[in-house]
Structures are given as C-alpha cells and as structure tokens.
Swiss-Prot record:
This is Putative nickel insertion protein. The keyword Nucleus does not apply. GO terms for molecular function: lyase activity; nickel cation binding. Keywords: Nickel. Belongs to the LarC family. PANTHER family: NICKEL INSERTION PROTEIN-RELATED, PYRIDINIUM-3,5-BISTHIOCARBOXYLIC ACID MONONUCLEOTIDE NICKEL INSERTION PROTEIN. The keyword Translocase does not apply. Pfam families: Ni_insertion.
Length: 395
C-alpha cells in the first residue's frame, strides 16, 4: 500500500493539506468539480505558487463570495455531506471528521452534540477544506496516512468564543491519545480542522522507513519567523522488506520501573501519562519483590525521540527512584485506518497488512465507545456493525 507521510513543519490546517495534495499532483479542477456537488454556493478555489523560506510550494485560498451563514449546526453540515455527490469513501471520511469535531466542541463547551454550532468550522471555507481533504485522498488512491507529531504553537488566539490559549481546547480534545509536541511558532500552528484531519485520517507517530516517490509542500497563510510555514507531504512506498516480506525491524526503547509503594490510582495515572508523553504502549504487571512484597512492574515502549519525555512522565507520576531502559527491535505490520459508515455514525477500522495482503481488521474502540454512548447501545453492537460495514465493501 502507498504511504502519504505528513510533516507539519509549520503546522497543519485544512487549506495546507489541500495545498500539499495539489502540490503532489492532485488536479485542482477535479477537486473543485467534486466539491461543487455539496451544493454550497459562493466559493472558488484560488491556487497559487508561493515561496516560503526559499521553499517553493502551493498555496490554496478558498475565496468566499456573497452572503454566507454565520454558523451551521452539525446536523446541517452532515446533511450537506450526505446529499452530496462526493465519492462514497470520501463522503464517509468527511462525515467522520465533522462528527469528531462536533464531539470535541460539545465536550469543551459542555453542551449536547445536537446543540453544537460551528463558527469557524461551519464556514464555507472550512467545509470545503474538510471535504476537499477527503476528496484529495480519494484522488490519490487512499494511501495510508502517517503523520509526524506536530508542534501545537503557543500564545493566544481570538475565536468566536473569545480569546483562548494556544492550542485551543478543541484542538487538544481532538488530539487526545495522539503524540504531540509542546511549543513551536508564536501562534496557532494546528487548527481545529487540521487536528481533526490527524485524528480521523492519520496514524500519528514516528514516520516509517520508506522510499519517497513524490513530495509536495502546502504553504500556509501566516509567516513564522523561525521556520517555513509549510506542511510537507511525501507520497511513498514502504521500504523494501527485510526478510520474509515484513516492513523490517525498528529500534525502540523499553522503560521499566518496579514499584512496591505506589497506590493503584497512581499506577493507572502513570500509564496514562506515559501514553500522553508519546509512548507507543504502556502496561503494568504484578510481581513479587524482595522480602516477599507484592509490587507492580510498570513498563512503557517508545522511540528515541520520546524516550526522555516518557521517562520524565514515569518519574513525575510514581514513587520510583529509577527507571531502567533497554533497546529492543520490533517488527510491525503495515497499519491503516479506514472510515466506514454505520447506523450509529462513522467508525474507523484499523486494517493490518503484510506485503499488501490483509491479515486483520479491527474497529477502533474509542470510536465505537463514543457511538455506543450516543446511541445508548452496547459497544459490541457498534463494533459488529462497523466490521460488517467494512466487509460489505470488500470485493
């Protein structure tokens, strides 16, 4: 399967993703034709070449003309998407992105999802950005999207709800469970739309070994003083397998600490903190320590870039006086998220492949749990519906 690797050098926003896709070779005319099926009048795509810190890339501006609604409700936006002529898989992806934004906004503002009204995200340009990203992936043949952890920016930003810290609460809500990097340029480097694209479409973490085929640069609107405001997108294929057709080993770190005086609540928090710091996995297992004391083996798996942060999280959240570490090699299957439409809403299915051959498909638990809570049904019912929807579209 082809890879689409995203590097948010200056951040990520919906227009930057569109621009990077066009710079990779997506036909803007084909993109516009598909988006016209949304039936939303008064906009056009302005595509220009632009240099940023000496890097030539593509800049996209969604030019809005005439009177437009000040905001739109989630139901209104989902109805637009459902009635559109977007390709089926792009329609599913767009629906999933908007639903994820709605859930994040509802949690941040303490209102039911049905009462969420989008201001910035409900504007025509954001609707075009989200649906355009889904159509662009369709035109690229739905490569597996992998993204490097983004820097979120710093400072304050003005929104329709008032002045908020950077990153805004909705951005952090959308990126829960994803590795991110604090700091960055003085401003909003990751927009809610950009965060939603990462949350729904991408696996965020260390980029895999690969063979670059084409490279595109999406240039943003703002100018950062210390870096080019670009999103780099690389269309690639996995690096040649080392051995029996797998993707080849990667070197990771196992971090461990033995605990015999740490309350169970803190152990649970330490696992959570390790994952927030960028650990690929974290766990706790019972063990018997010296003098027959019952204890806990706390462990985490991470890459070199996150080793210091994960170690710091283990020290900060537990009573341990030391953290052991040793390098390990891991071979992992190729993985990609594919959104499917169910009667409960859009759910991502994680698909595992080896050398292009599918070995398994598993509905994403967090998506299923959110849909189950909203519908008042058991999680396993949503999981079964998602798996059935995924299998129904296979040849």
């Amino acid at each position: 399967m082809a890879l689409l690797l995203l590097e948010p050098v200056g951040g990520i926003a919906g227009d930057m993703f569109l621009a990077a896709a066009i710079d990779l070779g997506v036909d803007p005319a084909a993109l516009a034709r598909a988006l016209e099926s949304l039936g939303v009048p008064g906009w056009r795509l302005a595509v220009t070449r632009k240099a940023e810190h000496g890097i030539q890339g593509t800049h996209v501006d969604v030019v809005v003309e005439g009177e437009q609604p000040a905001s739109r409700g989630l139901a209104e936006i989902l109805a637009l998407v459902a009635a559109s002529g977007l390709p089926p898989r792009a329609r599913e992806a767009a629906r999933g992105i908007f639903e994820r934004i709605g859930e994040a906004e509802a949690r941040v503002h303490g209102v039911p999802v049905s009462e969420v009204h989008f201001h910035e995200v409900g504007a025509v340009d954001s609707i075009v950005d989200v649906c355009g990203a889904a159509v662009a992936l369709d035109l690229l043949g739905w490569p597996e999207v992998r993204a490097a952890p983004p820097e979120l920016g710093r400072g304050l930003v003005r929104t329709a709800h008032g002045t908020m810290p950077v990153p805004p609460p909705a951005v952090l809500e959308l990126l829960k469970g994803k590795p991110v990097r604090p700091g960055g340029p003085p401003g909003e480097a990751v927009t809610p739309t950009g965060a939603a694209l990462l949350a729904v479409l991408a696996e965020v973490g260390p980029l895999p070994a690969h063979v670059p085929l084409r490279v595109g640069y999406g240039v943003g609107t703002r100018a950062w003083p210390d870096r080019p405001n670009v999103l780099r997108a690389t269309l690639a294929e996995p690096a040649p397998a080392a051995g029996a057709g797998g993707p080849g080993p990667e070197t990771l770190w196992v971090l461990e600490a033995n605990l015999d005086d740490c309350p169970g609540q803190l152990v649970a928090r330490a696992i959570e903190a390790a994952l927030e710091a960028g650990a690929l996995d974290a766990w706790a297992a019972p063990l018997t320590m010296k003098k027959g004391r019952p204890g806990v083996l706390l462990g985490a798996l991470c890459d070199e870039a996150r080793r210091a942060a994960v170690t710091g999280a283990l020290f900060a959240e537990t009573t341990t006086l030391g953290v052991r570490r040793h390098a390990v090699e891991r071979e992992a299957l190729e993985r990609a998220f594919e959104p499917v439409e169910t009667g409960y809403g859009t759910v991502r299915v994680k698909v595992a492949r080896l050398g292009g051959r599918e070995l398994g498909a598993h509905p994403e638990y967090d998506d299923c749990a959110a849909r189950a809570r909203a519908a008042g049904v058991a999680v396993r019912e949503v999981m079964a519906a998602a798996l059935a929807a995924y299998r129904s579209r296979r040849p």
